[in-house]
Swiss-Prot record:
It comes from the Bacteria. The keyword Transport does not apply. InterPro entries: Ribosomal_uS10, Ribosomal_uS10_CS, Ribosomal_uS10_dom, Ribosomal_uS10_dom_sf. Transmembrane segments: none annotated. Involved in the binding of tRNA to the ribosomes. This is Small ribosomal subunit protein uS10. The keyword Zinc does not apply. It comes from Vesicomyosocius okutanii subsp. Calyptogena okutanii (strain HA). One of its GO terms (molecular function) is tRNA binding. Keywords: Ribonucleoprotein, Ribosomal protein.
Amino acid sequence: MSNQNIRIKLKAFDHRLIDKSAVEIVETAKRTGASVRGPIPLPTKKERFTVLTSPHVNKKARDQYELRTYVRLMDVISPTDKTVDALMKLDLAAGVDVAIKLN
């Protein structure tokens, strides 16, 4: 696995959770002898929703909601077998979505 790279993409709605998970991944990879690029913060996706508060009339009464999706990207360069095993056993927070690709 010395000539391959691992690309890890983290997605979450809470920036504190995603930053803690990114730190855990970086520490685990460095402890097993691999080098890491990142975490690189990608642009935050903001979805805005406007909802009428009144069920019948009063068009002027509205509530606005926003859903932010935070994304971090990391590259693990020249991972060893120990690195892959440690990353597979790593237990991250429940609100973080992890996507792993081998290059």
